[in-house]
Amino acid sequence: MSIRNLFSWLLIVATITLSARAFAEGEWVVEKTFHVGGEGGFDYITVDAKSHRLYVPRSTHTMVIDAESGETVADINGQEHNHGVAVVPELARGFISDGAGSIVMFDLKTNAVLGTVVAKDDADGIVYDKSTGLVLVACGDAGVLITLKADADPKTAVIDTPIELGGKPEFLAVDGAGKVYVNLEDKDQVAVVDLKTRKVLAHWPVAPGGSPVGLSIDTEKHRLFIGCRKPQKMLVMSTDDGKVVGDLPIAVGVDATRWDGHQAFASTREGKLSVAEEKGGKWETVQTVTTGLGTKTMDIDNAAHKIYLPTAEFEEAKPGARPVAKQGTFMIVVVGRR
């Protein structure tokens, strides 16, 4: 390579690096709001970045929404009290957790229901672990983690033997290497589960936090991001030994955390999205985005740099009570980088 070509190549690399760094340091802003409407409550939202679809459980049905236009693509009926959705693009399948004690399997292309599998009480947080080919569901009232083979025959599928967790699970995160971490809300702990041996390896306390609910993971740097309600914190925990290495204050009513490869996020019912990152070995909040009352859950499309937060308009709250959502006002707030 000539000196001139080498210089040109180095200049291109430097430009790309600086551009990426500048983008990573950009501010997050509310870009738009999809006014979706429809009936029912809302819980965990799931983004399928490959198809640009949003999956939104609405109590008795699950809405499929175009992530770019906000238009409703389909509506999957037949649930009683749904909570979350896991998608498996390589199998063209989706899975809905139903708190009434079931997992609904559906086709990602047609959105048709393929089958319903008996689960355990209060089937709640749900994720897919590609390393094992398992769909994992935290069942709160039952106090167990259940697993289901993602490629199981929808007509004959049954769950594997449940794994007793020693507490009430809320959400979970997989490391892609055979382990899953599960928040135990009532025990102020994170349970570490080996999916190969199907045993709980450890219970890690979340002090100085408590009532852990939201959970996400940085598999490269071995970090968990734990959203706690009592007290209100986002904790950063090492997956090597359970040591808390970051302690960040957040707003009221957290229900989800996410990681984008550079920053960690915590969404809250109060309508404040906390953005945190590690600087000089110390975790700090670098931005707080006002997203609106009720935006307690979220999902992120890391490729598009978009965060989607479901909420609604609310009636004025009575003293000592939570505000009630107005019928037909469901919407999705879209946050992106500026």
List each model region and its residues:
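Bacterial N-terminal signal peptides
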Residues: 8-18
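N-terminal secretory signal peptides that target proteins for export/translocation
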Residues: 1-5
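Predominantly soluble domains enriched in secretory-pathway, periplasmic, or organellar proteins
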Residues: 21-338
